Amino acid sequence: EVIMPAYTFVSTADAFVLRGAKAVFVDIRPDTMNIDEKLIEHAITDKTKAIVPVHYAGVSCEMDKILAIAEKYHLLVIEDAAQGVMASYKGRALGTMGDFGCYSFHETKNYSMGEGGALLIRDEKNVENAEIVREKGTNRSKFFRGQIDKYTWVEAGSSYLPSELNAAYLYAQLEQAEEINKKRLSVWNRYWDGLGKLADEGKIVR
């Protein structure tokens, strides 16, 4: 069983359900639209393996409390930071606090390569397995590093490699990430300030 918020894109659940796990949905906080950390412990059973906090719209979950719960029950924390590139929680980048962090570079994101994403891994022992899954189930990454004289199929995997053209397109954006973020924040502030009067009149909620 994997605990996640009831409000998230279907990919969050798909990643686990397609591999035989059960998604356990927990309600969200109305102020952040993120998982309500106060409800997580009630959802934990002897089958629970991980908590998946989703940082909706780049707004951080209450990670200190979630990490404390995970430590108490010996659970993995897999951050869905698909919308959280360049966002932070108490000075720490979203996606870097759990055991794994997931970024998305889908075309709707602030930094895009059309599709694809990035997996951040805390424990080095998990890197090799991630490389195998990424490389169609082979140890090809080791071959490219000269660690083996030939590569072979070792377990089930798929193809998660972007084209060099798409990677270059993304890399150029990441080089300018601070400037891109600054411009987007300027646009956001313009909307926030401009809609303030309507909010004060009770015509909208912001």
Predicted regions and their residues:
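PLP-dependent aminotransferase class I/II
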Residues: 38, 42, 50-54, 59-65, ...
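PLP-dependent aminotransferase-like
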Residues: 1-81, 88
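Conserved active-site segment immediately N-terminal to the catalytic lysine
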Residues: 79-113, 142-144, 149-154, 205
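Histidine-centered beta-alpha loop that forms part of the nucleotide-sugar donor binding/catalytic region
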Residues: 7, 21, 28, 82-83, ...
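Alpha-helix termination/capping residues and helix-transition junctions
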Residues: 45, 94-95, 111, 159-162
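Short beta-strand-to-turn element immediately C-terminal to the catalytic PLP-Schiff-base lysine
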Residues: 103-104, 117-123, 171
